[in-house]
Amino acid sequence: MSAIKDDERSHTLVRPRPQTVIGKDTARDITDMMIAAVKDGEAKWTRLPGLTVAGKTGTAQIPDQGKYQENKTIASFVGFAPAEDPRFTMLVVLWEPQTSQWGSETAAPLWFDIARDLVYLLRL
């Protein structure tokens, strides 16, 4: 499809050309580091049975009137699986989580809950 047309208007669709942002070796290195973060790091319990998960936790302080306050954070977890041939990628971001300030304790568990359902739905 190259355009959308109706009786009054026509819109040409522009398809961006794919671009290589990082090389294959760099992508593999980053994936390996993300696999290690799940296997041996803060996000150990985001592992899914029978699948290799690549992921990374994140915790950032939110500035408040020019200063950072320890209890105001953004917690996150990004991951994809299976790492060798991803079928899904997901980012979970929580602003000012209440139970813990850390992405490994808040965003990662939520990611795991959703990922477990995706594994079932996608029959991985």
Language model features: what each stretch is:
Residues 16-24:
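Short surface loop/edge beta-strand patches of beta-sandwich-type extracellular domains
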Residues 23-27, 71:
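Amphipathic alpha-helical transducer elements in NTP-driven molecular machines
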